[in-house]
């Protein structure tokens, strides 16, 4: 019983395989895209005008030529107005069938009869759908689906951008995380049994003109970030979340809204004193950067069409001389290939390492330069004037002595003012007592009274 069932399944599988092979064996295959035109070939060995007829597989006549070079259609014009032939090619022995405005139901076998023989041509019409469409936001994905006759299996679909990017698949082709640079015309090819058909796709990706922005600044300088869009937008809202290199989490820096192309700040971190331009394109300025601000951020812009994201990076350099050591430090997202170099100007490098901090002990007097570079390209540089150690000590001693003398002078002035003020207070008290005694008329000519008054004065 089991053997009989297995045998039936095997026979059924062989029958299906033979039917599939029969579709293409001895036939010419032509591919066509829905809505476009297809040319089905039919060639004569005599290379001259001869009698020919094109038919459907059910023997219904489509068109033909039975002498005198006149094209005869097999039905009413309304039924066969999409079918035609190239009269100019007849004299060369070519009698193609042209089918315009292809439909999915046109996928079938067509028969060309000429010179007492028949030629079968298999037409496979496919339809291309784009989901969600050919106009998308940056970061979204596009799915290209190829619908075709159920007999068609595993075609190769390949789309190529003019800049060289290639995406390939079979009946389903996916393009994920699209960028603005992916916009423009794509040339696509469908290949089946070594037969090819071409179609074009114009893709429009809406978003920020740059996928990432990195600013390289020395400590104390201002940094400005601009976020231009490749399309006109009037309304939306957004925010910038920032993660400093020393922090382990993101925190909000600024939030804003866009209304009628005007930008308004909703909330901002006070410590940074961020400045946001009131008109598009979005432009953010940090008046004065420092090492503690170095890090990465994510700008989010929410529109009616969807949400856009923009990566923002800030790299900050600081060069300082402390005691007898010259230090150059960089913070922020840098490539592992970047190199930090510390040298005297117009001289060979003293220190050059793939690190974020370099130092020189007992640096020579003169102008020093710190450079952050990647390969031959210098990303940023900063300069500092180094003074000799003796000069530094003299300046320090002068500052200390000057401060000491200044303090002593100030202290003496305070004491003098206090003594003078105390003396004036005592004198005022004595005068007040004399006036009181005089007003009471207790004065007399007695010697002891005169002596008392004199002592009070």
UniProtKB/Swiss-Prot annotation:
The keyword DNA-binding does not apply. Residues 129-207, 208-317, 318-374 form the Ig-like C2-type domain. The chain crosses the membrane at residues 395-417. It is a single-pass type I membrane protein. Residues 27-394 are extracellular. Glycans are attached at residues 187, 298, 323, 392. It comes from the Eukaryota. GO terms for biological process: adaptive immune response; calcium-mediated signaling; cell adhesion; cell surface receptor signaling pathway; cellular response to granulocyte macrophage colony-stimulating factor stimulus; defense response to Gram-negative bacterium; helper T cell enhancement of adaptive immune response; interleukin-15-mediated signaling pathway. Palmitoylation and association with LCK contribute to the enrichment of CD4 in lipid rafts. The modification Phosphoserine is found at residues 432, 439. Residues 418-457 are cytoplasmic. It holds the Pfam family CD4-extracel. One of its GO terms (cellular component) is cell surface. GO terms for molecular function: coreceptor activity; interleukin-16 binding; interleukin-16 receptor activity; MHC class II protein binding; MHC class II protein complex binding; protein homodimerization activity; protein tyrosine kinase binding; zinc ion binding. Disulfide bonds join 42-112, 159-188, 328-370. Residues 1-26 form the signal peptide. Residues 27-128 form the Ig-like V-type domain. Disruption phenotype: Mice lacking Cd4 display markedly decreased T-helper cell activity. Integral membrane glycoprotein that plays an essential role in the immune response and serves multiple functions in responses against both external and internal offenses. In T-cells, functions primarily as a coreceptor for MHC class II molecule:peptide complex. The antigens presented by class II peptides are derived from extracellular proteins while class I peptides are derived from cytosolic proteins. Interacts simultaneously with the T-cell receptor (TCR) and the MHC class II presented by antigen presenting cells (APCs). The Ig-like V-type domain mediates the interaction with MHCII. Forms disulfide-linked homodimers at the cell surface. Interacts with LCK. Interacts with PTK2/FAK1. Binds to P4HB/PDI. Interacts with IL16; this interaction induces a CD4-dependent signaling in lymphocytes. Interacts (via Ig-like V-type domain) with MHCII alpha chain (via alpha-2 domain) and beta chain (via beta-2 domain); this interaction increases the affinity of TCR for peptide-MHCII. CD4 oligomerization via Ig-like C2-type 2 and 3 domains appears to be required for stable binding to MHCII and adhesion between T cells and APCs. This is T-cell surface glycoprotein CD4. The lineage of its organism: Eukaryota, Metazoa, Chordata, Craniata, Vertebrata.
